[in-house]
Amino acid sequence: MKAVFTFILSFFVAYFGFGQEKTLLFSIKGKDTKPSFLFGTVHMIADTAYYFPTKLEKTLGKADQLVLEIDNIGDRAKAQKMLLLDSGNVFDQFTPEQADSIVQWGSSLLGMKPEAFKKSFSGMKPFVLVQIGVQAMMNAHSKSYEMDLMSKAGANKQPVRGLESMESQFAIFDNLKPEVLTEMIMEGIRHPEKAAETQQELVALYVAKDVEGLAKLIVESEDIAGSAEELLYRRNRNWIPVMTDYMKTQSCFFAVGAGHLGGDQGVIQLLKDAGYTVTPIAY
């Protein structure tokens, strides 16, 4: 589960050859495409670590449109519907002992009575149980880069697009082997301190703008190794032709989880492999 926390928050150490300065912002240039930008986000972060300087805002303003990971990310009704099981009870997917541990853990985190927790979450997918842990680590003063970017794009009258559908992102967790997801959840319950430690490492690397360090942390997480193809690499590959199509007609500001950028199978390298020039921008 530590890996899932990392993936959700990455969000998810080498030098790029431009001095000691590191960055999460890059320009993208290629033949027959409009000059565009790539920015690495972390989906939720404490407001004390949040950094959105004027230069970043001005760079967003140079683009014709904002492109996030998920299309229609603001459709809360659709997202909530996709969190529901088609049928059955989520707690039936666990042994009685595991289900009891989940109920005690979740009700304690959320300040609910065990029976109320069980009733409220029985119709939810297992992925929602992961989200409980994520939300527990976030305080009331957390901020979201995606939400802020959408707000600024709206003020600029820039359209907001996505690299993949909401259905495809939810399918990532729907398609994980049940035993893999179960172990992720139970590991988080057994060792909550590990997830907290990983979050601290993740935030430190993000604040340091260390794209390669973030990729390394995520991929080397003990739980994610067997699922890196589904959680990261396949999505990265699928995004490149979509990015190309967008850039043929519009200058884009692409904003995706920073954990997707680094490494030999990260978005930066895949763009270079596709013939693009990707240049770091200090901000």
Regions found by a protein language model. Name each.
Residues Q20, T48, R234-N238:
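Short secondary-structure boundary/capping elements
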Residues T23-L24, F52-T54, I240-P241:
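A generic local structural motif
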